[in-house]
Regions:
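Bacterial Sec-dependent N-terminal signal peptides
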Residues: 1-28
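A general structural signal for short secondary-structure junctions and capping/turn motifs
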Residues: 2, 75-77, 115, 220, ...
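N-terminal, post-signal peptide beta-strand-biased segments of exported outer-membrane/organellar beta-barrel
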Residues: 22-133
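Outer-membrane beta-barrel porins/channels
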Residues: 24-53, 118-266
Length: 266
């Protein structure tokens, strides 16, 4: 009964913080990056700051002081009558200058939310919400083809995109016997990416001053998946620990539901 109250309390606290976190993650962290022009955008290094400092490595890590969202088997290491809660942040500072102008872009955002609570001895429940990818770009190009300039006029192309995809993990880790644990995470992928493309034509000969073509594409991602994980301690003492960890994530096809609209204005 006590574990049930503990789980309900943790879920209640989680529901209170989720709207704020989702709102914060609706802005692209890697804004104005040309690498986010196609597909899902810039893929995020997985794990909390503790694991990201190692390039996302850590499927074999198991410690009651840190939640390891990379391997659900590690959830079994949580101590009884305790719990772990972590909120991470991320900040980008971009500066660019030329001989005539300079610009800067700064953003601060909540990056991930992790929660780990014990359900029974050797059994832990974990929740993670973390970004999977970010999209943010703004590109403006001017047509330089002499043939188009002579027959159509001055043409300017504008491309603007923003959005992200987020993954939610709910999982259990169980330690059935000494030195071995396994676990499973159920993942829900969700994201919205908006891409705008505009073409502005200024004729050279025609009496029409300007013609504009506005286009918008909205991509919605919604898919589920799983992660299976296992860990085995070969040996452990007060000074050393050697653990083998493996994970398996079946392939998930993240195809978006896309809606596109194009409006011409003369």
């Amino acid at each position: 009964m006590r574990n049930s109250y503990r789980l309900l309390g943790a879920l209640g606290a989680l529901l209170m913080i989720l709207p704020t976190t989702l709102s914060a993650q609706s802005n692209s962290l890697s804004a104005f990056s040309p690498y986010t022009f196609y597909g899902l955008g810039d893929m995020s290094v997985q794990g909390s700051a503790f694991f990201r400092s190692m390039g996302g490595a850590g499927v074999a890590y198991s410690n009651y002081l840190h939640m390891n969202s990379l391997n659900p088997a590690s959830y079994a290491s949580v101590m009884p009558r305790s719990g772990l809660f972590n909120v991470g942040g991320e900040m980008y500072n971009t500066y660019a200058n030329t001989a005539d102008a300079k610009t800067s872009y700064n953003t601060l955002n909540i990056r991930d939310v992790n929660m780990l609570i014990p359900l029974a001895k050797g059994l832990g429940f974990g929740f993670t919400m973390t970004p999977l990818s970010d999209v943010g770009y703004r590109v403006k190009m001017t047509e330089m083809d002499p043939l188009i300039l002579a027959n159509v006029g001055n043409v300017v192309y504008e491309y603007l995109g923003e959005g992200n995809t987020t993954q939610f993990k709910f999982g259990l880790g169980w330690n059935p016997f000494k030195n071995f644990a396994f676990g499973v995470d159920v993942i829900y992928y969700h994201g919205i990416i908006t891409r705008n493309f505009n073409t502005i034509v200024t004729p050279v000969i025609s009496e029409t001053t300007e013609r504009t073509l506005y286009g918008t594409q909205r991509e919605t991602y919604s898919q589920a998946g799983v992660i299976l994980g296992a860990q085995y301690n070969l040996f452990a003492d007060e000074l050393r620990q050697f653990t083998i960890g493996v994970t398996y994530r079946p392939r998930v096809n993240l195809r978006p539901k896309a809606t596109r609209s194009i409006v011409a204005q003369a």
